[in-house]
Design a protein with these regions (language model features):
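N-terminal secretory signal peptides and thylakoid transit peptides that target proteins
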Residues: 14-37, 41, 230
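N-terminal secretory signal peptides
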Residues: 1-22, 49
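Structured, non-membrane catalytic/scaffold regions adjacent to prosthetic-group chemistry
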Residues: 56-318
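Ser/Thr/Pro/Gly-rich low-complexity linker/stalk segments immediately outside membranes or between
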Residues: 47-56
C-alpha cells in the first residue's frame, strides 16, 4: 500500500466526508459571544525567537513505561501536520505553519481553586517535577480517525498532589491560553474562547492520565499543544487540553468548550465508546496512513479505567 505523506492527505480522506463537512458547517454557523473577554490571560504582541521552544530539542532522561502500547507508531510528520487545533485553524493542515512562531517562553501555569496550596509554576519547573516517561498511547479523534503517539511526560497525579486538593474538589478544570494575537483562530467565534476542558478527580488521578510536554523524544511542537498539555488516552482527543495556563479544582462539573457548543455530540465524559453514536457511528475508526477501517475499542482499549465508571450508564453519561 502506498502511504501518503501528511502534507498530501486531505482532511476528507481521513475523516468521513459527510462528518467533516457537517462539523465545518456547524462551526461556521456558530455565534458565541462575550466569553473571550472573561479570561485574565494575555501575552505580548511581539515574538522573540529566543522565547520559542526549539523544534527538535531532545528531552534527557526519558524512561520507558509499562503503560505503553506495542502498536506501530504513527510517523512524526503525520502527527505534526494533521492537527485539530482550532485556536490556529479549523483546517488540519494549517496549524503547523500558523503555530511556528507561537511563543512558549516565558510561560506560567496557575493552580488554584479547592486546594490547600495555590501555586504558580514556570513551565520548566513543572517539567522538572517528576521523571519524564515515554508513553506510547493510542489517540482517537471523535471524527473517526486515530494515531499512535510516543508522548513524553509523567502522570498528571504528580502535579495534582503538589497542590493538595481539598476533600470537596471533585473536578479538575484546564484552561488553554487566550492569545488571539498569536492564535488566529481565536479571532473567530467558532468556539467559546479560551478553550476549557475538565475531568472528574478520579479520572485526573488515574495513572494513565498524562501531563505531557514532549513526543518522539523531543519537546512538543507548537501545533501539538506546546508547551504543556494533557493526554487522556481513553477519551476522544478534544478532552486533552493543550497549551495549558490554568488548572482549577472545583466541586462542580466544569462547563467545557465543546460540550457548550454541542452537548449531544460532545458529552462531558466523552469516553471512546463504539456503542455510543454522537453525530455519526463510532463503531469503526481509520488509523492515519491505513486504508482499511478497524473496529473501535471500548475506552480506546484502555480497560484499566473501566472501574472508574462502574454502575454508570455510559450512553446517558457520554
Amino acid at each position: 500500500m502506498l502511504i501518503k505523506k501528511a502534507s498530501d492527505i486531505r482532511s476528507s480522506e481521513i475523516t468521513p466526508q459527510d462528518l467533516y463537512l457537517n462539523r465545518r458547517k456547524f462551526l461556521t454557523g456558530m455565534a458565541v459571544s462575550g466569553a473571550a473577554a472573561a479570561t485574565g490571560f494575555g501575552v505580548k504582541e511581539l515574538l522573540s525567537p529566543s522565547m520559542r521552544a526549539s523544534a527538535g530539542q531532545k528531552i534527557d532522561g526519558i524512561q520507558k513505561s509499562a503503560l505503553s502500547t506495542t502498536e506501530k507508531i504513527t510517523p512524526y510528520n503525520d502527527v505534526t501536520h494533521y492537527n485539530n487545533y482550532y485556536e490556529f485553524s479549523t483546517q488540519k493542515e494549517e496549524p503547523a505553519g500558523l503555530a511556528k512562531d507561537f511563543k512558549t517562553r516565558p510561560w506560567t501555569v496557575k493552580i488554584d481553586g479547592a486546594v490547600k496550596k495555590k501555586l504558580e509554576f514556570g513551565v520548566d519547573d513543572v517539567i522538572k517535577l517528576a521523571t519524564p516517561e515515554e508513553r506510547i498511547y493510542r489517540h482517537r479523534c471523535v471524527e473517526g480517525w486515530s494515531i499512535v503517539v510516543p508522548w513524553v511526560g509523567y502522570s498528571l497525579s504528580e502535579l495534582i498532589k503538589k497542590a493538595e486538593p481539598l476533600g470537596k474538589a471533585k473536578y479538575v478544570e484546564f484552561t488553554t491560553i487566550y492569545a488571539p494575537n498569536q492564535m488566529p483562530g481565536q479571532r473567530r467565534e467558532v468556539l467559546q474562547w479560551p478553550y476549557v476542558e475538565g475531568l472528574r478527580m478520579d479520572e485526573a488521578m488515574h495513572p494513565l492520565a498524562l501531563l505531557c510536554f514532549g513526543m518522539y523524544g523531543e519537546v512538543l511542537p507548537n501545533q501539538d499543544g506546546a508547551p504543556l498539555r494533557v493526554v487522556i488516552p481513553w477519551k476522544y482527543g478534544f478532552k486533552s487540553a493543550k497549551a495549558i495556563v490554568h488548572i482549577r479544582f472545583t466541586d462542580s462539573q466544569p462547563m467545557t468548550t465543546w460540550n457548550l457548543a454541542n452537548p449531544p455530540a460532545y458529552g462531558f465524559y466523552s469516553n471512546v465508546n463504539p456503542n455510543v453514536d454522537t453525530y455519526h457511528s463510532q463503531a469503526y475508526e481509520r488509523r492515519l496512513g491505513e486504508f482499511r477501517p478497524r473496529p473501535t475499542q471500548m475506552f480506546n482499549g484502555y480497560d484499566q479505567v473501566a472501574g472508574l465508571y462502574s454502575g454508570m450508564d455510559l450512553k446517558k453519561n457520554y
